[in-house]
Amino acid sequence: MLPLPLIANGKGFIRALENDGALAVYAPLEGGYEGRYQRRLRANGYASISLSARGLGDVEAYLMQVHGVRPAHLGKKNIAQEGAVGPIYFAQPIAGYQLENLPAQSKGLVLWILEGYILSQTEIQDLISLTKRVPKLKVVLEMGGDRVFRWQPLLDCLQAA
């Protein structure tokens, strides 16, 4: 009996991610495939973070720099002191903090970004250039659904659009 493609060891996916740094993936809409490939990445020495593309804003600042965020305005304001925009809170960078604290034997950090189809061409280009500048950072961007789990270099996806 031949092994099913679902039980493959994921070597081609990992090799493509290591070569290109950023991949666009298309997964069946019923789900389950993402978790399998994330588990294979972790088994091969990568740390993994899943996040949504919604609300990323400035990709470089959100992922690699300390950045200011404003909480939702709930109708309360201090008329005498501040405007209605509210205070600024500073958040740690999502990827930068994780990269600094990777174990010594780790191969790198993989950002698995959901709903990547909402990102603009410029934001996708920023992700690609970020993986070129930071070699330990890899990006997997979910770009939509398909009947089978497939991937392509994110740069090819950018050129096709």
Curated annotation (Swiss-Prot):
Keywords: Membrane, NAD, NADP, Plastoquinone, Quinone, Thylakoid, Translocase, Transport. It is a peripheral membrane protein. It is found in: Cellular thylakoid membrane. It catalyses: a plastoquinone + NADH + (n+1) H(+)(in) = a plastoquinol + NAD(+) + n H(+)(out); a plastoquinone + NADPH + (n+1) H(+)(in) = a plastoquinol + NADP(+) + n H(+)(out). InterPro entries: NAD(P)H-quinone_OxRdtase_su_N. One of its GO terms (molecular function) is quinone binding. GO terms for cellular component: plasma membrane-derived thylakoid membrane. Its EC number is 7.1.1.-. NDH-1 shuttles electrons from an unknown electron donor, via FMN and iron-sulfur (Fe-S) centers, to quinones in the respiratory and/or the photosynthetic chain. The immediate electron acceptor for the enzyme in this species is believed to be plastoquinone. Couples the redox reaction to proton translocation, and thus conserves the redox energy in a proton gradient. Cyanobacterial NDH-1 also plays a role in inorganic carbon-concentration. HAMAP family: NDH1_NDH1N. NDH-1 can be composed of about 15 different subunits; different subcomplexes with different compositions have been identified which probably have different functions. Belongs to the complex I NdhN subunit family. This is NAD(P)H-quinone oxidoreductase subunit N. It comes from Synechocystis sp. (strain ATCC 27184 / PCC 6803 / Kazusa). The gene is ndhN.
